């Protein structure tokens, strides 16, 4: 029986994989939280990998506090860069497989067309820099790795934009949401299923892939969709990102082109509204 290690087990994606795992009991699933797969302690992480001895690693764990990363660069790079390289090296040396999760924040937002896997990377914040460094080391240490870049992840688990909007729309009569950052949300349950479909596929084709739900929207439009599905009475006002300054810059355009993953792994990618409906169901 093949053993799958899921890092970041209590996060959005790890939690969705946990839900799906019961339907795939041909695998032994190991769900490791930050104490069982210590991505911020490389020496300990190495011994944990040896002890678990996985055949497949889903590296869902990451340092994702985008604004905080600006002042915690060392920690962000340890988790998002150095730990990734260590996992990739372990996987190569032990003839295992790795799916590593990355981000749209490796891009600078200057594009006006959906970004494919070959698009020029140029992160504009520490979080994006650390994730790009992780991608580079991942493929350097193990060229057979699969990296999936995703964006705007949400789920019924953990903290995310959808749950924040639900709370604010219940508490307030009016909220402001930025309307000049464009991309597409990712329902973590869809991404989790895509990852399982990849390991179930007869072929393992390494490299970088993009995955998010279909549709091109702003955060404001996403908030309007949440309002509509939730039946909230709160007024949503679109504002420019310049009116909502944050320590870390965000890319203004980071829509991901999903043609490669759809073609190579024959995946159907749902529209964001369809997936948002599933979360509300």
Model-derived features: positions:
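Catalytic helix-loop patch of NAD(P)-dependent Rossmann-fold dehydrogenases
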Residues: 78, 82-86, 106-148, 153
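NAD(P)-dependent short-chain dehydrogenase/reductase
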Residues: 136-183, 190, 196
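Glycine-rich Rossmann NAD(P)(H)-binding loop
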Residues: 177-182, 209-216, 264
């Amino acid at each position: 029986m093949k053993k799958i290690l899921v890092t970041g087990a209590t996060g959005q994606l790890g939690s969705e994989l946990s839900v799906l795992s019961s339907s795939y009991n041909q695998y032994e699933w190991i769900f490791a939280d930050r104490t069982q797969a210590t991505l911020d302690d490389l020496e300990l992480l190495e011994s944990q990998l040896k002890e678990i001895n996985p055949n497949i690693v889903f590296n869902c764990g990451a340092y994702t506090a985008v604004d905080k990363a600006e002042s915690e660069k060392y920690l962000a790079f340890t988790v998002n860069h150095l730990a990734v390289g260590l996992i990739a090296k372990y996987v190569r040396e032990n003839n295992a497989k790795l799916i590593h999760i990355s981000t749209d924040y490796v891009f600078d937002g200057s594009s006006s067309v959906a970004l494919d896997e070959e698009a020029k990377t140029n992160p504009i914040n520490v979080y994006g820099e650390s994730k790009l460094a992780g991608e580079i080391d991942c493929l350097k240490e193990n060229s057979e790795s699969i990296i999936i870049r995703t964006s705007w992840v949400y789920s019924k688990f953990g903290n995310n934009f959808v749950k924040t909007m639900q709370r604010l729309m219940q508490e307030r009569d009016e909220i402001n949401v930025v309307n000049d950052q464009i991309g597409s949300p990712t329902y973590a349950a869809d991404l989790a299923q895509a990852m399982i479909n990849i390991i179930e596929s007869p072929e393992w084709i390494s490299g970088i892939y993009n995955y998010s739900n279909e549709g091109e929207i702003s955060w404001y439009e996403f908030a309007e969709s949440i309002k509509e599905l939730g039946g909230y009475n709160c007024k949503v006002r679109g504002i420019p990102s310049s009116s909502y300054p944050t320590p870390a810059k965000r890319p203004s355009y980071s829509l991901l082109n999903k043609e490669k993953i759809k073609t190579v792994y024959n995946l159907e990618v749902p529209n964001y509204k369809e997936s948002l409906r599933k979360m509300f169901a």
